[in-house]
Amino acid sequence: QLPTGLYKKVLVILHDSILPYMNEPTLMIDFLTVAYGIGGAISLLALNGLFILVHQHNLEYPDFYKKLYSLLDPSIYHVKYRARFFHLADLFLSSSHLPAYLVAAFIKRLSRLALTAPPEALLMVIPFICNLFRRHPACKVLVHRPNGPEGMSEDPYIMEEEEPSESRALESSLWEIQTLQNHYHPDVAKAAAVLNQSLSEMEDDISGLLELSACELFDKEVKKKAVDVPLEFEQVRGLFGKKNDIFAEHFTLE
């Protein structure tokens, strides 16, 4: 068991400064699997190395997706390594051969956690979820279930369930995304409203959104130029004498 600080220093550089120069990268399997099981930021950082071993060296990691699913907690939208995590999660969930229940569980948990996420994270995760729907059409029952019940007394999805197959995600619906359609940030509300329509076949490019920050959003809003200057919340329809005219209620020519 290494100190947490040392784990982080090694894992940050492992995938590009250590593994490519090893004659037998598979020797790092035990180290990475132990690090992946620790949890928190260390598990997130271990994903990079594991990704290389799984895809380039045929590493078999039992319950890999169960562990990846367990990493989804409220902090995932706030951690320093958020961009790296979602980049790798996007790669791991890119296969069209993944079972629908597994992808639905990821979609549902990401959506539930999104209810308390900051706008900069929401503008990234909503297109991320849309891409999962494009890859796995069977999950679209979460937004459109033709033969489903008219209403539900409660959400069947079990957020606390650690096993994705037992979470009952496919029986649920994405009411969380519908809630985000009323978000205070107009860009978030607009992004969430995309699911009200048929999705295009082409995936959204989220690479430019992974490292989006609150400062960038603020600067974007500050630099916006208003087309119409907001002078009054109720437009004047006339001057004196017209029925129900606000100006005439307070002033008179007499």
Language model feature labels by segment:
Residues Q1-S95:
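Extended alpha-solenoid helical-repeat scaffolds
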Residues N58-E254:
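Eukaryotic scaffolding regions of large macromolecular assemblies
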